[in-house]
Amino acid sequence: MAKKSMIARDVKRKKLVERYATKRKKLLDEFNSAKDPMERLEIHRKIQALPRNSAPSRMRNRCWATGKPRGVYRDFGLCRNQLRERAHKGELPGVVKSSW
């Protein structure tokens, strides 16, 4: 189980990303379409003025069952240990153990 403070930090980051998503997208579109270097510099400063944790690249995928940050399968939102455990119990529909 991950530390509760780390899970809370990621939840906080997720909220910030959602809150600033439209503003960040608008600024990035302006930045990419701007031709004048001084205009690009000004837009870049505006992007940098946004909260650091509002960038989507700072979010971390975590297992929803345990909060572990590594070995998380995107399709299920579970870490590898939980995925194996729940698949063996038959709690994941459509998942079968491989055999050849």
Curated annotation (Swiss-Prot):
Molecular function via GO: rRNA binding; structural constituent of ribosome
Stretches that traverse the bilayer: none
Endoplasmic reticulum recorded as keyword: no
Coiled-coil portions: none
Swiss-Prot/TrEMBL keywords: Ribonucleoprotein, Ribosomal protein, RNA-binding, rRNA-binding
GO cellular component entries: cytoplasm; small ribosomal subunit
GO biological process, one term: translation
InterPro entries tied to this protein: Ribosomal_uS14, Ribosomal_uS14_bac/plastid, Ribosomal_uS14_CS
Subunit comment: Part of the 30S ribosomal subunit. Contacts proteins S3 and S10.
Function: Binds 16S rRNA, required for the assembly of 30S particles and may also be responsible for determining the conformation of the 16S rRNA at the A site.
NCBIfam families in the cross-refs: PRK08881.1
Family statement drawn from the similarity comment of this UniProt entry: Belongs to the universal ribosomal protein uS14 family.
HAMAP family for the chain: Ribosomal_uS14_1
Annotated protein name in UniProt: Small ribosomal subunit protein uS14
Species of origin: Prochlorococcus marinus (strain MIT 9211)
Lineage: Bacteria, Bacillati, Cyanobacteriota, Cyanophyceae, Synechococcales
